[in-house]
C-alpha cells in the first residue's frame, strides 16, 4: 500500500509543497485544515521607521493595501525567504534573518538598534506570535501590531490515518486541528508529524504526538527536502 504525505498547511504553501513533492514522485494528499481570511484592519496614519512582517499571508495583504504605498523606501524585515520574496516585489529595502524564525528576527541589528518612541509596524495574523511583540515592547518603541488575517478552520474529509506516511503542519493552530481530527479517528497520535519550528514541535508533543520532527524552517524548499529525506530513511 502506497502511503501519502498529508499536507495540512494552508494555501498557497500547500500547493507549492505538493508540486515539489510530486516532482520527486512522492504521493501527497493536499488537505489544508485552515483557510486564510483577511481582516479589515485599519492602518496607522503615522509612517513607520520599520515594518516587520511575520508571514507570507500578511505580506500579500499588506502589499495590496493603499497604506503600503507610502512605505516604498522604508526598511522591511521578513520572517524568512518566502515572505521576503513577496515584499521585495514592492519594497526593495527588505531583509530577512539567516535563522528564519522569531529568534532570528530578534537577533537582527535593526531590532537591537530600535530606539524609544520609534514607530514600528508588526504585520501578523490574529493568532500571531508574541515573542517578537514582547521584545519590541520592552525596547520602548511605539508598536502597532496589525492583525491582517485570521486562520479559519476548514473541515477535512476522506483521510485514513493508516494510509498517511506523515503529516506536514505549518502552525500551532493547524497542529491543534490535526490533533482533533486524528483523535476522532481511532484516537491515534502515532503518525509522524513534521513541523517548521521548535515551538510547534513542543505543542505537538504536549498534545500527545509521539513522533515529531522539526525542519527548522517553513520554507517550501526546505520542507520538501526534509520530507524526501525522512521518507528515504523509513
Where are these regions (language model features)?
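Signature of uroporphyrinogen-III synthase
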Residues: 1-234
